[in-house]
């Protein structure tokens, strides 16, 4: 347990930051799962839309130091490569 008031404050801030970072990390994972779901359905148009939203959230995570830049780039690259390999769904 912290004895100094500054150490107590630092401990409180750590708890607060940890909750915020977990929330942001969970949101990023959720958006990635949405893209993967659209890819599994084979819906290229919706997958592209979901990827653009996920890409935005992933890069926001990089800016907030939730994930590293290379990790984000790798995730985006792999998702976009999977979408690119899909055939265009011509059903109307």
From Swiss-Prot:
Pfam families: Ribosomal_S20p. It comes from the Bacteria. Keywords: Ribonucleoprotein, Ribosomal protein, RNA-binding, rRNA-binding. This is Small ribosomal subunit protein bS20. GO terms for molecular function: small ribosomal subunit rRNA binding; structural constituent of ribosome. Belongs to the bacterial ribosomal protein bS20 family. HAMAP family: Ribosomal_bS20. InterPro entries: Ribosomal_bS20, Ribosomal_bS20_sf. GO terms for cellular component: small ribosomal subunit. NCBIfam families: S20. Binds directly to 16S ribosomal RNA. One of its GO terms (biological process) is translation. The gene is rpsT. The lineage of its organism: Bacteria, Pseudomonadati, Pseudomonadota, Alphaproteobacteria, Rickettsiales.
């Amino acid at each position: 347990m912290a004895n100094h008031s500054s150490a107590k404050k630092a401990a409180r801030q750590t708890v607060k930051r940890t909750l915020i970072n977990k929330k942001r990390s969970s949101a990023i994972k959720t958006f990635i799962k949405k893209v993967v779901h659209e890819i599994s359905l084979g819906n290229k148009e919706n997958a592209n839309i979901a990827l653009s939203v996920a890409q935005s959230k992933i890069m926001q995570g990089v800016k907030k130091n939730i994930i590293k830049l290379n990790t984000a780039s790798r995730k985006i690259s792999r998702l976009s490569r999977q979408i690119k390999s899909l055939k265009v769904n011509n059903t109307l």
